[in-house]
Amino acid sequence: MVSAMAAPDPDILLLLAPDFTDAEGRRCYCPACATVEGLLGYYPALRQALTIRYIGFARPRAEVVALIGAANQGLPALVLADATPVELLADLAVRTGNGRRFLQGPASIGRYLARRYGSGEPH
């Protein structure tokens, strides 16, 4: 079951802010980020368990660069708490940037959240 209490060193979920304007001036949204938003809607307690940051579309994305490096600006990303047990990461594509472990993409993020917080797992 998802705990409503945030950990002292919480995982940090980075999502593109919804309804952004791209370089051509079109209103857009990120489908992968929308999938993760849907997961947060299904399991609202995840919002209390995670630190969630909405990032603007334009690059460079300073907050993302500071956390996981310039080469890793694709979102969604979940920056893992330093104390994350390695057994929760089995078979997930864990990446490293700026000394931090992170996951990218809704499927990996969803599987991790299920293991860590007890939400449903992607099927």
Kindly give the residue locations of the regions a language model identified.
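GST-like domain detector, emphasizing the conserved glutathione-binding G-site
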Residues: 2-123
